[in-house]
Amino acid sequence: MALVLLTNDDGIFAPGINALRARMEQIPGLEVWAVAPDRERSASGHAITTYRPLFPVRVEIPGAVAPCISVTGTPADSAKLAIEAILPRRPDLVISGINRGANLGTDIFYSGTVAAALEGPILGIPALAVSLDSMTSSDYSAAADFAAQLALKVLEEGLPEGTLLNVNVPALPREAIKGVRVTKVGRRIYRDQWVRRMHPRGQEYYWLAGELAEIHNDRESDVSAVEAGYISVTPVHLDLTRYDQMDRLRQWNLTF
């Protein structure tokens, strides 16, 4: 029986992970566990906790069959702790999500959803990161169905070592989704604004605000696919090396 770990960055009680859990529980032959942060931890990146202990707590989720465990840490903490200490054995697949909001383009470098999924490849386990392109929709059914379908395919076919699939689903009625595109990481740049405020006790503080900048992305990008109404599936690899630049750097004759 294949063991599947579900995790996220929105927290164990978030609707996305519970829609995914409910869908995965329907698949015969799978053992499902959900281990996720105890609260909202979006945009945590790949932070892990080394300065205090982590407390896993079994929680009750209405209708859940799978064990559901909250962790007092980051998304990466939750996945790492689950794989190395909590689960009864090594999982066959890690799925992070379903995230509230897209993780497209350069979002992946900030995303707690993607970071939690990356703990799979870091430890030699295939993984999916799944996001819905909406901050307000409560309908995760299409994303859950596609994630379940893709999970079975990955369990059957496997993925290359060090690889995860980053999946983004447009927030459209099921019948309006045009299909699936295999894509590359696009560009998604924000015009950041730091809103300065003053605490009643005299200390200044800042809120990060801003909006998406208009960036041209070609048709093969994840950004363009979702904007056009397609589900994007992007293979992402742990190895960030620019091999084409290694010889050029050697020609600099760097010394010390």
Swiss-Prot record:
Q: Where in the cell is it found?
A: Cytoplasm
Query: Keywords of this protein's UniProt record, alphabetized?
Result: Cytoplasm, Hydrolase, Metal-binding, Nucleotide-binding
EC code(s) of this entry: 3.1.3.5
Disulphide-bonded residues: none
Enzyme kind, highest EC tier: hydrolase
Give an example GO cellular component term for this record: cytoplasm
Instruction: Give the protein's cofactors.
Output: a divalent metal cation
What reaction(s) does this enzyme catalyze?
A: a ribonucleoside 5'-phosphate + H2O = a ribonucleoside + phosphate
Note accompanying the cofactor annotation: Binds 1 divalent metal cation per subunit.
Sites binding a divalent metal cation sit at 9-10, 42, 99
Q: InterPro entries attached here?
A: SurE, SurE-like_Pase/nucleotidase, SurE-like_sf
Gene Ontology MF terms in the entry? 3'-nucleotidase activity; 5'-nucleotidase activity; exopolyphosphatase activity; metal ion binding; nucleotide binding
TM region positions: none
- Give the main localization category: cytoplasm
Signal sequence, renumbered to the chain: none
A Pfam family this protein belongs to?
Answer: SurE
Q: Which HAMAP family match?
A: SurE
Q: Which family does it belong to?
A: Belongs to the SurE nucleotidase family.
Role, per record: Nucleotidase that shows phosphatase activity on nucleoside 5'-monophosphates.
Protein name, per record: 5'-nucleotidase SurE
**Whose protein is this, by species?**
Symbiobacterium thermophilum (strain DSM 24528 / JCM 14929 / IAM 14863 / T)
The uppermost taxa in this organism's lineage are: Bacteria, Bacillati, Bacillota, Clostridia, Eubacteriales
